[in-house]
Amino acid sequence: MKYKLLPCLLAILLTGCDRTEVTLSFTPEMASFSNEFDFDPLRGPVKDFTQTLMDEQGEVTKRVSGTLSEEGCFDSLELLDLENNTVVALVLDANYYRDAETLEKRVRLQGKCQLAELPSAGVSWETDDNGFVIKASSKQMQMEYRYDDQGYPLGKTTKSNDKTLSVSATPSTDPIKKLDYTAVTLLNNQRVGNVKQSCEYDSHANPVGCQLIIVDEGVKPAVERVYTIKNTIDYY
């Protein structure tokens, strides 16, 4: 009996040695940046990543790439949004993010490397005691952000003039599969859309591939769009 148990014990011990320690929480910087730049937040010692959104024809509609320091600060961030014809490329320089091409100061930072102000748009951000961005405001609008106990973004509410747009996300009850979620969008308390996402995960509990279904309920009949998200992630 002892001889039969030995290989099993060795296998368990070896597996334990190789097991990656999973970090279930999201840093304030990762969660807050994901809100502002519209990408899925990641966990653990991320070194660099690229998230690519593709439509049903396999055409790239959006791509977000970032590099991070070992402390979790974004050293660079690049956003390519083909649907809205938008390109943003930022590089960290002391207390600012500069435009990667013109080197113009674009975003002022607070604390270690958290968002503070976007001077050109008159936008300023406020953080809570844990360093998460909870408010953004300008002369034209006010936004409030919500997070769960692990720092996962649960949605936001935007108020501008006489309009209130609210997005509420409900993640999976499995803490490993946080990016499996559903979300509902309300405009002035009227439902105008819903989202459902399901993913496959790596050993750090980060998504490597997802299916994203977006339903526009603001039109009749409702329009459903299906997207695929591909992630490449390197770790420290």
From Swiss-Prot:
<keyword id="KW-0472">Membrane</keyword>
<comment type="similarity">
    <text>Belongs to the UPF0257 family.</text>
</comment>
<keyword id="KW-0732">Signal</keyword>
<keyword id="KW-1003">Cell membrane</keyword>
<dbReference type="InterPro" id="IPR010646">
    <property type="entry name" value="UPF0257"/>
</dbReference>
<feature type="lipid moiety-binding region" description="N-palmitoyl cysteine">
    <location>
        <position position="17"/>
    </location>
</feature>
<dbReference type="Pfam" id="PF06788">
    <property type="entry name" value="UPF0257"/>
</dbReference>
<feature type="lipid moiety-binding region" description="S-diacylglycerol cysteine">
    <location>
        <position position="17"/>
    </location>
</feature>
<dbReference type="GO" id="GO:0005886">
    <property type="term" value="C:plasma membrane"/>
</dbReference>
<feature type="signal peptide">
    <location>
        <begin position="1"/>
        <end position="16"/>
    </location>
</feature>
<keyword id="KW-0449">Lipoprotein</keyword>
<protein>
    <recommendedName>
        <fullName>UPF0257 lipoprotein YnfC</fullName>
    </recommendedName>
</protein>
<keyword id="KW-0564">Palmitate</keyword>
